[in-house]
């Protein structure tokens, strides 16, 4: 049975959704200056968006997509730019081209969504002056509703859904089989830890889909890009991202050995991230039953063919992790930590150049089912 808007039971609003925005501002350590890999994902996804609009977006004689009314687009997990602007322009251009083939031209309204402590000031200061859309910011967790029912025609989410709403409680419980002592992630850990992370991802992704099912119009599209695994047979520990997480943990332990932080603070720190396989994603979408999977696959990323760059990688990881690390350990550890981290990256250069090829930038094209 196809789920209807009114039959979808929304998950309860989380009592404590963790928010870990990317490093704000526009200095040398900011996310806006250190997100070229993420831009590569968006550039690679442009062809996917063009094809999805051309083949899957039914505009002709469809009152849901009346060109007299604005065509509304939402970017969930927009961060601080400029990548979100590239993604939104790709969508606007694709939809506009299709409307023009029907001799129609709507106005476009783009909504930029992220947590309330995202640096929206930097985002809106850098809005393209010649943009072809009206812009608005929408603060709030995308794991819950942030828009009215049937209000969004095209949803987009890039490199955001691997961030969990919270760390799985089992891995912080000393009496649990999943207690993750001495590690900051599920890289190379026991199966109980991996299971706890996947369980949290499953709950979060289901909440995301339920919320979007209420907000997206029937026939509306959603394109998702997420770092993940090409299949369930590939271990996260055998990927470049897995090695990045592992070395961040070992770098923190070096600070413990130097007496800069204590071991208990590392034991109580875990990264709220899960990198899913295609099978993980398909399972949750099919259980949700509100969207059809129009396309799923792996994006070709141009940087995968470049030599591993230690300094650039260290800066990118710092831009992503600085806020969550500062919140737990304080900002005084950042410089010594990333000095050690850069050294560890250099020492493992040969491993990265091989393992990073096993990472997968996954994409999904989903279409909202009819009631």
UniProtKB/Swiss-Prot annotation:
Keywords: Magnesium, Metal-binding, Methyltransferase, S-adenosyl-L-methionine, Transferase. InterPro entries: MeTrfase_7, MeTrfase_capping, SAM-dependent_MTases_sf. S-adenosyl-L-homocysteine binds at residues 31, 78, 83, 114-115, 141-142. GO terms for biological process: indole alkaloid metabolic process; methylation. Loganate binds at residues 37-38, 162-163, 241, 245, 273, 316. Expressed in leaves (especially in leaf epidermis), flowers, siliques and stems, and, at low levels, in hairy roots. Mg(2+) binds at residues 180, 267, 269-270. Pathway: Alkaloid biosynthesis. Its EC number is 2.1.1.50. GO terms for molecular function: loganate O-methyltransferase activity; metal ion binding. Its cofactor is Mg(2+). Gene3D superfamilies: Methyltransferase, alpha-helical capping domain, Vaccinia Virus protein VP39. Strongly repressed by loganin and slightly by S-adenosyl-L-homocysteine. Disruption phenotype: Large increases in loganic acid accumulation. It catalyses: loganate + S-adenosyl-L-methionine = loganin + S-adenosyl-L-homocysteine. Binds 1 Mg(2+) ion per subunit. Optimum pH is 7.5. Belongs to the methyltransferase superfamily. Type-7 methyltransferase family. Component of the seco-iridoid and derivatives monoterpenoid indole alkaloids (MIAs, e.g. vinblastine and ajmalicine) biosynthesis pathway. Catalyzes the methylation of loganic acid (6S,7R) to produce loganin. Weak activity with secologanic acid as substrate. Inactive on deoxyloganic, dehydrologanic, epiloganic and loganetic acid. Homodimer. This is Loganic acid O-methyltransferase. It comes from Catharanthus roseus (Madagascar periwinkle).
